[in-house]
């Protein structure tokens, strides 16, 4: 085995110690003390988002963007507003400003499971690619832990780089008023999708850390998991590890699979699939510790096999 990918969600940044929830941003001084341009002072989209400031997860915030767009389309909410596009751009700009500051100032969590996993990944050269749904710079956040990765990293929803934009939007098959189609993630030139699908299909091993596999991002994964649960001659058995927070988040992912038509029993039988709950791992619960240690041993053994195969290949080229 040699093709491994790592997929990161906001739970990864939270585990590192960043305050990167939707609620963290909405109650931050960056947002609360903002100076809103006169052109969007009466923007209904921003008013709607502020009413939802108790939401924690970003996938819930994106669901509210979809609800807003549907209500406008169906004529059951505020009337169509030309300032909503500008308000959406302003919201993204302020979020980027907040995260840039948080990225620089956050206090690293010394008990971070995410950092321990990345240390193992870096030291053993486990992974070929990283796909992150976070906006933060992976190298800059890991630098707080004196870690540096040169693994090829794809920022699925844009990044905090000056040359990049962040993407906060929707995915839906439902009809949306044409004036609100700016909310579609696929309309952004920074949207990156195809490379993830191709990498997941060709990978031997996939690790998810802190991704809810839920909400607006679920279409990325739905077809993949359905395919992996079916018995076909072309099916490649994969090692799939999902790091989630606790029983509740674990169950939420399982429920998402069921609702999407994924046969969980077949998925488990036809793949080496493991859930690791970081809350109980941090509490050193024996069952989670065993799964964690088994994963590290497996990755190290597999890394050695790959290195040995590479050495044999090089040797054969010289003889």
Q: Residue locations for each model-derived region?
A:
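Conserved catalytic-core helix/loop/strand module for nucleotide-ribose chemistry
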Residues: 1-5, 10-205, 211-319
């Amino acid at each position: 085995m040699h093709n491994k990918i790592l997929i990161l969600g906001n739970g990864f940044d939270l585990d590192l110690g960043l305050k990167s929830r939707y609620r963290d941003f909405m109650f931050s001084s960056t947002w609360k003390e903002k100076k809103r341009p006169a052109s969007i002072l009466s923007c209904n989209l921003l008013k709607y988002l502020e009413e939802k400031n108790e939401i924690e997860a970003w996938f819930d915030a994106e669901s509210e963007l979809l609800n807003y767009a549907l209500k406008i389309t169906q004529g059951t909410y505020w009337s169509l507003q030309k300032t909503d596009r500008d308000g959406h751009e302003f919201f993204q700009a302020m979020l980027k400003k907040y995260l840039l500051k948080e990225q620089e100032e956050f206090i690293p969590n010394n008990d971070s499971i995410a950092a321990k996993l990345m240390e193992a990944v870096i030291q053993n050269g486990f992974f070929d690619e990283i796909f992150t749904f976070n906006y933060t710079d992976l190298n800059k956040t890991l630098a707080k832990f004196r870690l540096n990765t040169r693994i090829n990293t794809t920022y699925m929803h844009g990044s905090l780089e000056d040359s990049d934009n962040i993407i906060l939007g929707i995915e839906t098959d439902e009809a949306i008023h044409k004036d609100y189609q700016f909310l579609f993630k696929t309309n952004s030139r920074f949207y990156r999708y195809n490379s993830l699908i191709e990498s997941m299909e060709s990978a031997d091993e996939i690790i998810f850390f802190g991704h809810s596999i839920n909400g607006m991002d679920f279409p990325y994964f739905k077809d993949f998991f359905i395919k992996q649960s079916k018995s076909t001659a072309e099916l490649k058995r994969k090692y799939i590890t999902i790091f989630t927070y606790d029983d509740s988040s674990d169950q939420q992912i399982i429920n998402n699979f069921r609702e999407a038509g994924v046969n969980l029993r077949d998925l488990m039988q036809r793949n080496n699939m493991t859930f690791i709950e970081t809350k109980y791992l941090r509490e050193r619960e024996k069952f989670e510790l065993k799964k964690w240690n088994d994963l590290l041993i497996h990755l190290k053994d597999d890394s050695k096999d790959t290195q040995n195969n590479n050495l044999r290949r090089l040797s054969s080229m010289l003889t």
